[in-house]
Amino acid sequence: MSLTDGNIIEIDNLSFKYARQNKCILKNLTLNIKDGQWIALIGHNGSGKSTLARLIDGLLKAESGSIKVDGYEMNEKNIWDIRKKIGMVFQNPDNQFVGADVESDIAFGLENQGVPREEMVSRVADALKVVGMEKFATHEPARLSGGQKQRVAIAGVLALRPKIIILDEATSMLDPEGRKGLITLIKDLKDEYKFTVISITHDIDEATLADRVIVLDDGKIIDDGKPESIFIKNDELLNIGLDIPFAEKIRRELTKKGVDIPNKYFTEEEMVDWLCQFKQKN
């Protein structure tokens, strides 16, 4: 099915509220996501990020409005075809594990899709190799570290060959090193396999790596753009309870101390380069 203007996801005038609640979590939200983009969804708790992800995957039903995924309208007829196109990795991978060992857990989703056994064995092996977990194929998931569990969860998603991967706070329970390793892995996989990534995160430094950042507040999109255009607006982010990137914190502190630093967005690498040049000149 052909995509409209290259949009893998099209959301129009979407509203949603939970049962027994008067207030809408999402309010007349309209959003298009291009095929192959890495999107970071940021916002404080209760802003509607995870709710939006579950609506895209068909786990929740919208109050009003429409969702299209890969050209398919979200409805009872298409919902299972849509779910085959989406893989979700959650905050706590233990909630996703159903197999006695790693390889049987990854095979579970393939069995549900009726994948022939020979192909299933090949896909499981390939997915484990891609995430660097082939040596743990016969291990119990419960005995793995947090980072290893998330790699297995990602392998389970990759084996299904989705067009969209949704990361719902997938790195929040990892230490900084594990978080960095997992994001690097996903970025490399995205570049190789050309899937779309939607990352729901509280980690602002993680969000800086996205192609596009969408800021949600009170169920509405209040900002949308490239990381450099979003994270230069420090005061606006702080006012809605969000953090700012580490490099921006440094830039703000240097400015307060009277250092003549450009009023522009810096990535961490750019900040390190600027500080090195500044030190050489002074």
From Swiss-Prot:
Subcellular location(s) per record: Cell membrane
Domain named ABC transporter: residues: 9-243
Binding site for ATP: 43-50
InterPro entries noted in UniProt: AAA+_ATPase (IPR003593), ABC_transporter-like_ATP-bd (IPR003439), ABC_transporter-like_CS (IPR017871), ABC_transpr_CbiO/EcfA_su (IPR015856), ECF_ABC_transporter_ATP-bd (IPR050095), EcfA_1 (IPR030947), P-loop_NTPase (IPR027417)
SS bond list: none
A GO term for molecular function: ATPase-coupled transmembrane transporter activity
Signal peptide: none
Enzyme class: translocase
GO cellular component, one term: ATP-binding cassette (ABC) transporter complex
Cell membrane in keyword set: yes
Keywords, sorted A to Z: ATP-binding, Cell membrane, Membrane, Nucleotide-binding, Translocase, Transport
Membrane topology type: Peripheral membrane protein
EC number of this enzyme: 7.-.-.-
One Pfam short name: ABC_tran
Oligomer status and interactors: Forms a stable energy-coupling factor (ECF) transporter complex composed of 2 membrane-embedded substrate-binding proteins (S component), 2 ATP-binding proteins (A component) and 2 transmembrane proteins (T component).
NCBIfam families on file: ECF_ATPase_1, PRK13635.1, PRK13648.1
Described function: ATP-binding (A) component of a common energy-coupling factor (ECF) ABC-transporter complex. Unlike classic ABC transporters this ECF transporter provides the energy necessary to transport a number of different substrates.
Family: Belongs to the ABC transporter superfamily. Energy-coupling factor EcfA family.
Stated name of the protein: Energy-coupling factor transporter ATP-binding protein EcfA1
Species of the source: Ligilactobacillus salivarius (strain UCC118) (Lactobacillus salivarius)
